[in-house]
């Protein structure tokens, strides 16, 4: 708003300056015509001369002798006498009433250089649009004002946009930007749906709602399968666990018992040798061993049996309690060594799955 106000003030100053220049030019022309008339009057005092603003007969105002009426009053019809010379180039032809207000310069200065025009007159208030005044000046004075139309900024003003037009342009740009963003969003959604359709194993759905429902059902099925796999898979947990129980998963062939021992603890280099020593001390033989390590944690699943057959009740009471206490001691030893070496650098986390299966041949059992 400030910039617009400054531009309007500059245009008003330029307009006032141009009007003053026009008045000065017309004033010089007026006095030049008076001098020319006086010079010609000494040669022919009985005649009067008519000078036009553009050098044409009857197109301007009439200059009379000294005994005639003052030019500020009503003027008689012009004669056909032409001036002998005209040193200054006159402006282009203008309406006859244009010079009527020129002689009343004192009032014009007090009213802010107000000019009178045919069809316009002094009825126009000072609040009238400045552009209309510039347009009338340009049409009335022709080349005089047209040459100064650059400083007036008339053409520039006509090319300027109004505040409402600027707001409309901004709204149009915002609407186009919103439409472009919406188009890109829909394109991304369609690309994601196409990827989901390609991931599903067997899909015949084409509409978006059915496709999303099928994807949700497939994700639920994958989650259920993952839960089942996690229960049966040998993945070590974050907490230490120890379970010892009889099992029928493995058979010796001669009717001997089989015990399944599951051990989950921190991994260390001497864990496996300690377990082997413990089992040998209890006179147990390993039939199968499954070992899984993930990120410094290890899970051992052992299937063991006794070396010699004995009573079933004695075996159950002896094996379950003894194996559980022995493996618990191995776990505690692992925890103590882990706490003592906590200041050392941590072992690099890595995942591996190793399965060791030790199965004795049936011929060895039969020989016994």
UniProtKB/Swiss-Prot annotation:
One of its GO terms (biological process) is regulation of DNA-templated transcription. SUPFAM superfamilies: HLH, helix-loop-helix DNA-binding domain. GO terms for molecular function: DNA binding; DNA-binding transcription factor activity; protein dimerization activity. Residues 173-222 form the bHLH domain. Keywords: Coiled coil, DNA-binding, Nucleus, Transcription, Transcription regulation. GO terms for cellular component: nucleus. It is found in: Nucleus. Its main location: nucleus. InterPro entries: AIG1-like (IPR045847), bHLH_dom (IPR011598), HLH_DNA-bd_sf (IPR036638). Residues 337-368 have a biased composition (Polar residues). This is Transcription factor bHLH30.
